[in-house]
Amino acid sequence: MAIPFMETVVGFMIVMYIFETYLDLRQLTALKLPTLPKTLVGVISQEKFEKSRAYSLDKSYFHFVHEFVTILMDSAILFFGILPWFWKMSGAVLPRLGLDPENEILHTLSFLAGVMTWSQITDLPFSLYSTFVIESRHGFNKQTIWMFIRDMIKGTFLSVILGPPIVAAIIFIVQKGGPYLAIYLWAFMFILSLVMMTIYPVLIAPLFNKFTPLPDGDLREKIEKLASSLKFPLKKLFVVDGSTRSSHSNAYMYGFFKNKRIVLYDTLIQQCKNEDEIVAVIAHELGHWKLNHTTYSFIAVQILAFLQFGGYTLVRNSTDLFRSFGFDTQPVLIGLIIFQHTVIPLQHLVSFGLNLVSRAFEFQADAFAVKLGYAKDLRPALVKLQEENLSAMNTDPLYSAYHYSHPPLVERLRAIDGEDKKTD
C-alpha cells in the first residue's frame, strides 16, 4: 500500500496553520491591551503607544486574511492536482513556440514562468493593500504607484536574467551528480551565495535605492573612530535613501574580509536625537561582527543546506513520492518542490531554533555596545526606533518566542540595564 505523502503534507500544513493562528490570536489579545508594559511607562508617550497599537492591529487583521487565503490556495493546489496539471500545461506550450518539450531545462523554465506570473497576480492585491492602504494610513509609505510598478518590473527583470542559468545549472548537477550529488549541489549553492552576497550590494541594491557616501562631519568621524578602535576594516560608509519608499529605519553592514561597509538609512539619521545614539546603534551592529555572529549564522545555513540536499538525494528517485503528488515522471525541480513540502515539520523546528539563536545574538550585541560605554545612548536609540517604526509594545511571550528573531523591546531594555549595572 502506497504511503499517502501528499495527504500527510496537506494535513500537516493545516495543523501548522491552526497552531500559528492560535499564536496569532494570542498576539492579537496582547495588541489590544490599552496600557503600556510597566517597563515602558514614562519612556514612550501615550500618543506613540496609541499609534503603534493601531498600526499593529491593522497589520494583524491583514495577516489573518492573508494567511487564510494562502492556506486555502496552497492546500487546493496540492489536493486537487493543480501542480502536475500546471507542469503538463507548461510543457504543452513549448511546441507552439518551436521548442523541444522533452528538454527538461526548457520545460522547467516554462513552468517557472507560469508560476512566477501566477504568484505575482495572486500576491498583487495583498501587496497593494499593504503598501498603499496600511502603510499609507500610518504614515510610512512614500512610494507612488509608478515606483511600485517600476520596482516590480525590475524584480521580474532580475528573475528573468538570473533565474534561467541557475535553474539550468541545478538540473545539470542533479542529472550528472551521481553518488556525490549532495556535495555538488551544496558546493554550487555555496559559491552562488558568495557571488550574490558580493554583487547584490554593488549591482542589485542600487537599482532600487540610491547609496551616497556619508558626508564628512562629526558623525562620520565618530563611526570611523569606533570602527578603528575595534579593528573593523571599514572601507566605505553609505547613507541609503530609504525615505523615498518608507519612513521605517535601519542600519546594517556587509562585505568580506578586509572590505567591510556600513549603511545607514537616512530615516535613522533623521529620527535619532543625536549622533551618539546613531553611533550606539552602529556599536551594536559591530558587536555582531566582533562576536562572529555573521560567521556562525553563515556556517549554520551552510550545514542546514547540506543536510537538506542530503535528504533530497535519498528521496529524489522515489516513484511512490512523485505519484502521491500526481506525477508520472520525476522532473528535478518538481522533486525539489515535493521534498521541501515533505520536510515542512523540520523546517518549522529549524526556524524556531534559528530564532532562539538570533535572539541570543541580539542580547550579546547589546551587551557588547554597553561594555563599550554606549548604554545611555543605546537605550534611547532602541526606544526611538521602536517609536518611529510603530513596533508592537505589548507582545505575547509564546508568539514572540516562536516568531521573533529579535527580542521584544522590554526584554532588551531590561537586559541593557542589567548589563550596565555590571559595568558600573
UniProtKB/Swiss-Prot annotation:
Identification of the protein by name: CAAX prenyl protease 1 homolog
Matches recorded under Gene3D superfamilies: Metalloproteases ('zincins'), catalytic domain (3.30.2010.10)
Purpose: Proteolytically removes the C-terminal three residues of farnesylated proteins. The substrate specificity is only partially overlapping with that of FACE2.
Main location: endoplasmic reticulum
Binding site for Zn(2+): 284, 288, 362
GO biological process, one term: CAAX-box protein maturation
CDD domains found in the cross-reference section: M48A_Zmpste24p_like (cd07343)
Family per record: Belongs to the peptidase M48A family.
Ranges annotated as spanning the membrane: 3-23, 67-87, 109-129, 155-175, 185-205, 295-315, 332-352
Recorded GO CC terms: cytosol; endoplasmic reticulum; endoplasmic reticulum membrane; vacuole
Cofactor details (free text): Binds 1 zinc ion per subunit.
A Pfam family per the record: Peptidase_M48
Subcellular location(s) of the protein: Endoplasmic reticulum membrane
Catalytic activity: Hydrolyzes the peptide bond -P2-(S-farnesyl or geranylgeranyl)C-P1'-P2'-P3'-COOH where P1' and P2' are amino acids with aliphatic side chains and P3' is any C-terminal residue
Tissue/organ expression: Expressed in leaves, stems and flowers.
Entry EC no(s): 3.4.24.84
Keywords: Endoplasmic reticulum, Hydrolase, Membrane, Metal-binding, Metalloprotease, Protease, Transmembrane, Transmembrane helix, Zinc
GO molecular function, one term: metal ion binding
Cofactor section: Zn(2+)
UniProt xrefs under InterPro entries: CAXX_Prtase_1, Peptidase_M48, Peptidase_M48_N
Membrane topology value: Multi-pass membrane protein
Active site: 285, 366 (proton donor)
PANTHER family noted in UniProt: CAAX PRENYL PROTEASE 1
Domain of life: Eukaryota
